[in-house]
From Swiss-Prot:
This is Cathelin-related peptide SC5. It comes from Ovis aries (Sheep). Residues 1-29 form the signal peptide. Keywords: Antibiotic, Antimicrobial, Disulfide bond, Secreted, Signal. The keyword Signal applies. Thermostable. Disulfide bonds join C86-C97, C108-C125.
Amino acid sequence: METQRASLSLGRRSLWLLLLGLVLASASAQALSYREAVLRAVDQLNEKSSEANLYRLLELDPPPKQDDENSNIPKPVSFRVKETVCPRTSQQPAEQCDFKENGLLKECVGTVTLDQVGNNFDITCAEPQSVRGLRRLGRKIAHGVKKYGPTVLRIIRIAG
C-alpha cells in the first residue's frame, strides 16, 4: 500500500515536471531573435510601402545591452535596407531578391518586440542625410541651369 502511494506521488510529480517543461519550452519558442524581429518588421514595411520594389535588410546594428528579457517590451533597433530588383507585387520573399544596382538605400530606426505572436513594431525609414543633401543640391543646380542657362549662353556668345 505504501509503495503504491509513493509510486502514485512520483507519477504526479513527473507529470507536473513534464507540464512545466512544456510550458517553459513553448514560452521560449514564442520569442523571436533580435534579427528575426527586424526581418519581420522589414516584411511589414514592404507590405505597407507604395514604392515599386521591395527592400531587403542590408545591415543591422548590434542590439543594445539590456537586462530585461521580456519579449513584450519594445527593443530599440537601427538598421539599413536597400532596394531590390523584385517588384513589390511579386510573391517572392525580399530575402531571396538581389539588391538593385544603385538601388535606393534607407536608414531605419525604431522599436520592435520579440514576441512572436505580436508583430509590434514602430519603424521609421529615410534616405541617409548625405544622399538627401546631394539630391537637393542636384535639383537646385538643375533649376539654376534651367532658369539662368539661356542668359549664361547669351553672355558667352557675346563675350566670345
